[in-house]
Amino acid sequence: MFTDDIFLKSLRNNIVLAIVLPVVTLTLSFALASLITVGGSMRGQTRGLKASGFYRTVSFFPYVIPAIVIGIMWSQIYDPSNGLLNGILTALGFEMFESFPWLGDERTAMAATIFVIVWSMVGFYMVLFVAAIKDVPAETFEAARIDGAGRFRIAISITLPLIRDNVQTAWIYLGILALDAFVYMAALNPGGGPNNSTLVMAQQLFTTAFTKGQFGLACAMGVVLAAVTLLFSALVFTVNRLLGGKDDGGR
């Protein structure tokens, strides 16, 4: 199994996803949550943007759409000939994108796929962080403002440490999603993309078991996938502990 170049590439793709997907998704989610909750006027009482409920609803909407529907929808948007994305870019004067294969080019296939997953998940984690930030006493932000801290300093030095445990939980969930990601990958690139550039272990496991009929090898792949998932979770807990997060149920 570990001498199979295709399996090793799928493992590498999973590791890339497990690193990039949580970082991008949580960064955007935290930035949007901070903007909505404490990103309003710096005058008077600390407050978020007006109509924040509307922004939360709109951002959360993609999360309630089934993953397979999202995959099919974006595969049509990315379509080289009749896709909406190429149509818009061409209309704006970018003629080089007239028939650009976003999912068919090895240079862009993984990035285009990650964008779709981030788009579908960022709203959920934004709402999660909004709820966590609202639990922080308003006096904490007021004191920071009186001391002269700006929005960015408040977000990084005050807000983020106080919701560290929420970030840890979100990171683990996103990591598990990245290590699976079967539905998104199968819908966007059923064959694993150009030169297997988007192939993940779950896809390789499915093909090995149900197309090739090699169930023993597929079980071994499943064990490797489970081990990688446990290792990822342990790594997140360890990093959080080293950075000063709570341990033993918040002790």
Question: Across the structure, where does each feature detected by a protein language model lie?
Answer:
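A structural signal for multi-pass alpha-helical bundles of membrane permease subunits
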Residues: M1-R251
